[in-house]
Amino acid sequence: MVRIAEYSRTATFAWSNDRIPYLVSGTASGTIDADFSNESKLELWSLLGTDADKPSHSVSTDAKFKDLDWSADNKYIAGAMDNGAVEIYEFNSSKQELKKQGSFKNHSTVVRTVKFNSKQNNVLLSGGNSQEIFIWDLNKLLDSKANYQPLTPGVSMSPIDEIHSLSWNKSLAHVFASASNSSFASIWDLKAKKEVIHLSYTSQNTGLKSDFSAVEWHPLNSTRVATATSNDNEPLILVWDLRNSNTPLQTLSAANNQGHGHSKGILSLDWCQQDENLLLSSARDSSVMLWNPQSGEALTEYNTTGNWCFKSKFAPQAPDLFAFATLDGKKIEVQTLQNYETTLDEEVSKTKQQESETDFWNHVSEEKAEIKSTVVHLQAPSWYGNKSASAQWAFGGKLVQVTKDGKGVEVNKPEITDLKSDDTLKNALASKDFQPLINQRLVKVVNETNEEDWNLLEKLSMDGKEEFLKEALELDEEEDEEKDQEGKDGDEFFQKIESNFQPSGSFKIDSNEESVINNILSGNNSKAVSELLKSGSILEAFVVAVTCNDEKLKEDVKDAYFAAHGKESSLSRVLFSSSKKNSDDIVENLDISQWKYITKSIYNFHANDEVERTNKLLQLGDRLLANKNRQDALVIYIAAGSLDKIATVWLNEFSTLENKIKDQEKTIYEAHIECLTEFVERFTILSNFVGKKQKITNESLISKFLEFINITSATGNFDLALLFLDILPEDNEYVIAEKKRVMVASGKVVDQSQSRKGKYGSHANLASAGFSGHAKQPVNLPPTAAPFAAQTMGGYAPQAVGAVPTPAVPVPQTRNASVSIKSNPYGPAGTNVGTSDNKFNAYAPPTHTQVPVATPVTSSFIPPANPYSNVAAQSLAMAAEQNAMSPNLAGSAPPVKSPSVYSGQTPHLNKKANDGWNDLALPVKEKPQRAKPVTVAPSPILAPATNGAAAAVPTKSIGTVFPPTGGNSRVPSSMVSPPPPQKRASRTPSLINIDDVVNARPKAHTSIYAPQTTQAGPAPVAPQSDIPLAPTANPYAPNQSVGSTPLQKPVNPYAPPAQQAGIPSAANPYASQIPSKAPVNAPPPMSSKKAPVGPPPMSSRKKAHEGKTLSHEAASVLDSSKPVQTQPIASELSREPAPVPTSASQTQVPPPVQETPARNTISPIDMAAPAVEQGISAAQQPIRDFFSSELARVTPLTPKEYNKQLKDCDKRLKILFTHLEKNLLSQPTVDKLLHIIELLKEKKYHEAMEVHKDIATNHAEEGGNWLTGVKRLISISEATA
């Protein structure tokens, strides 16, 4: 038996109209529980609930239920009570709660049945004894409960007494049917206000009229209705067509189905709303029958273990499920229609028959009887038989479906209007501003521990790691002040000693000290110390050892002191560790409540040993964690820079947070997704502030990130998935597989089968890459020269400028020429023996080959610039011939994420520090100089276009041309500059991440092969023109004159470039070269001035320092005069390459944009365009006045241990005032701040906190660091009110 759920209640029930339905049960009238309790309850059950004995919600009632019904909109539940009342309950789906709205006693006796109208959710029918049928309008009923009077249906044509069943017509909202014990079923029309038809049936066997116990309308046909008889001798289901109401259209009985049917009176009917060929009935014989009311066939018999199965109902929106209730069995059971005996059941039966007698009697009391259904006629429901659209969700949130004709497949991505994507995390990763995300999380924390974590991150984001640790690890302010005062007194004390003591007067050597004094005066200090130590004069021994400055004697005296007094005081223990410069004893044995002293000893004793300092900090963190000081342990792990330890702590708590979210009435999947997202956000923010350069090695952590990436990709958010994939280690096989999958699904990797491979890699077809939105701009240009023509250039050789284009005869590009005689790569051009293979020699000079001359042709191809030439020195009037190392791409293409392309040399552990392996790691400022002249024929100066197409200046499409994906394609020089010329076979590939360069901000670099030019900002876009583009010059070979047109001088690759107005220099060799009419200055470097910072969260814990067992002397020993060092663990990933020496001839390079440090992280509004301080407006002045006065009010009322919180609150509020002065807040945010002030004045602190949450949720980007200050002030104001 396919049992879905079973509830041990003797109760009637009703289904909700949900896809995953709820079930509500009410204690059945006329029954007594097993414990003889007379208690009555209305209980709500969820089919997804794990505990069948615990309802989702329960309400006690004054009477028991005869019937229950649920409105079609799921809002109201009506109960027919045995005390003559109709009770209305409201269902809150979000909280899964039932709330009683009223009890209405208009019936004179018991109410037997209630029924909601399926067309009008507010209309309710109720039926009872004494011909009482009432019609209720819930809208009016709930508005005026005391004065409301229900309506009656009108005049009855037939005698009726007890109303057993009511049913609304499914097509006509004003028509309903009733069944009573008077042998009549009545059809009522509310428009006519009377009974319009009555039905009766006379038995052919007995000649007596049968009483009707149930009535049910056809789901589609308004003239067809079914009735059931309660006669135990002849139980029948009669289907009527009202157009011929004298004779039943169909009779459903056991006699007509070879004995398959009910044997006793039928008590309920339910006609399936989704399939008119299915009718469910239950009877006193404890059976449930499934019928085909159209053909009259019995389909399936569902036997129950109880007696009197008085109600059975399909789930309205999940008709494959049905429930039935029994009296004797004391249960409500939910089953599925697929309750058939399977081969597995047969095998179980055979196994039981083969077991021994002993096993049978041992298990007979434990086994639960499972009664299988009897299939009379197998009939599939219509929702299985109908052909539905064949569809399947695919990776990336796409929907794949078969077309209506069944001959094709459609793939699309549905847009869900009610589903709003939250891009807060994605925006935070892009801008490195995590404050909006932190603000949102602080107002929806999971539990107290989770709130402490987000408070810690908020403090980190405001102060930065260094300031955060400095404040977190210092002792209380009072102790610091006393220490400073004691330091001053100590200096004065020593000054007094030095100035006041002067020996005077006569003295005599004591006889007991003669031997010691003799040794001292004789210079025998070793014996003197030995005698002093034997006599216990350790102080005098110290003086002798210090005076003679003998290190061995000093050690002996110290050893003697510690042997005698080491266990007497904490000062002695600390002095021992200090003398040895060893923190082992303090780290292992000092009371963990004084962990800040332990931290001071670690930083003092291991100031120059980073590895040992980190190990000791981790040891201290483990002690704190074992002692349940979780938050202090996290602070120490942050000081040690150990993301792995913090990740382990958070991963261990993952299931706890997930269960907490699950308790908030969310499904298991929803709770898991929300918890996983929160964890990823939390760890991402932490790693950004603590261990940005660290490599993730924790397998469990990688697994969580991969799960998040998989879910993110499944929704189509590939950009966010790729951002996280770049964080994970590239050598992990699962990360590699996931990255390939995401890259292919996002269309950022070109299938190798669609690429045309050449000698230097595949030349991808732009169309096959899936790029869109960038139209190709047609430009006239000459065809490229033949592979062996004189104009054919190497991969790093720009061609001569101003040369007459020489058409080429198409020659297939084969990987191996038939004859290949390699020339000297450094020799002069022009020597060609036989056939050369220079087309594929990246460093070879051009050769001379006679080719036929033809007129230029128009092509839509826009060649990319030579990535290894000096871009700024080339005139924009010339065009580059196709680079042998570049792909055949044109137009503006989006950045292509390439899996590890190959390059010339391996940059050692420097993936993101610089874009080029031999570029300068630091900004270099040098005086720009013009290039030295080269002895070549002068070239004509190209003037701006005045008239005619010939004078127009061509330009490439606005955008960037990128290298091909995959293969052995070369990479731009902004990533890896070329090594000296060498043979191709000697090149060693290395893995380079192209996205790090493409998506990076432009930086100025220098290269020993490609001198840089002065960086300029973006130039205005000029209109494109169709003009042939000339080839570029070769910096490694003399220029060849073709035709009579004079050549423009080539670029000297080892000399500074000449400055030319209107040509923006490209730090990125793939950036578009856009001409301008005037020089454009480079943008000034971003200011590194520290941004305003905001306050820590209110709930951050203030731990009182427990230092009662450690003396101030010990604290003075631990405390060093040097500042506390907070150096992170050294990591190879964080090392920057040494700067490459540059010559004085290099041009001046403005410094690149510096990455904002963690401590300066502010919201985008803080980074907004120049904000001019305009002063706080009159409308906003109350914000400053009230917050300032309120802070002044609470300050003297707040305990001293919260002084830090007050100072922090003051600092954050000053940030808010600065924002107001600069007019950086939007009007809605200002209005809400003013509303908070009004609520605080009225002492409505809870409402004020809700407005604060609204700002944090809907205006998180404006909240910045000041928002926590407002929250803290609200809390302190409430505490001191």
UniProtKB/Swiss-Prot annotation:
The major lineage groups are: Eukaryota, Fungi, Dikarya, Ascomycota, Saccharomycotina
Q: How does it assemble?
A: The COPII coat is composed of at least 5 proteins: the SEC23/24 complex, the SEC13/31 complex, and the protein SAR1. SEC13 and SEC31 make a 2:2 tetramer that forms the edge element of the COPII outer coat. The tetramer self-assembles in multiple copies to form the complete polyhedral cage. Interacts (via WD 8) with SEC13.
What is the official name of this protein in its record? Answer: Protein transport protein SEC31
User: By its UniProt entry, which Pfam families does this protein fall under?
Assistant: Sec31 (PF11549), SRA1 (PF07304), WD40 (PF00400)
What protein family does this chain belong to?
A: Belongs to the WD repeat SEC31 family.
Query: SMART domains under this entry?
Result: WD40
Q: Tell me the function of this protein.
A: Component of the coat protein complex II (COPII) which promotes the formation of transport vesicles from the endoplasmic reticulum (ER). The coat has two main functions, the physical deformation of the endoplasmic reticulum membrane into vesicles and the selection of cargo molecules.
Q: Name one GO molecular function term.
A: structural molecule activity
Q: Which UniProt keywords apply?
A: Cytoplasmic vesicle, Endoplasmic reticulum, ER-Golgi transport, Membrane, Protein transport, Repeat, Transport, WD repeat
The yes or no answer to whether the keyword Manganese is present is no
Feature: compositional bias, Polar residues:
1037-1047, 1118-1129
State the GO CC annotations. COPII vesicle coat; endoplasmic reticulum exit site; endoplasmic reticulum membrane
Q: What is its main location?
A: membrane
What highest taxon heads this organism's lineage? Eukaryota
How does this protein lie in the membrane?
Peripheral membrane protein
Q: Which gene encodes it?
A: SEC31
Stretches the record annotates as Disordered: 960-991, 1010-1157
